[in-house]
Amino acid sequence: AKKQLEIFSDEIIEFITLNNYVLIKTSPGFAQSISYYIDQLQMKEILGIIGGNDTLMILTSSNEIAEFVCYQLFP
C-alpha cells in the first residue's frame, strides 16, 4: 500500500494537522482512492478515515499522533 501512495503523491495538494485530525487536500477524484490505500497500511495510530472527492480526513487520538501519522505518510 505504501508503494501505491507514492504513485498518488502528485495528486496530493496539501496536508495539515488540526488537533487530532489530518486533513489532506487532493486533486479532484483522488481522495477516496488515497484514503483506501492509507487504510490498507493498517496503522494502529489511525482511528478512522473519511474520504470525499478532493479532501480526506484522518482521525487520530491526539495532536501528537496526528503529526506522527503525517510524518509516516509524507516523510
Set out the residue ranges of the language-model regions.
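Non-DNA-binding regulatory cores of transcription-related proteins
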Residues: 2-70
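Compact structured core domains
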Residues: 71-75
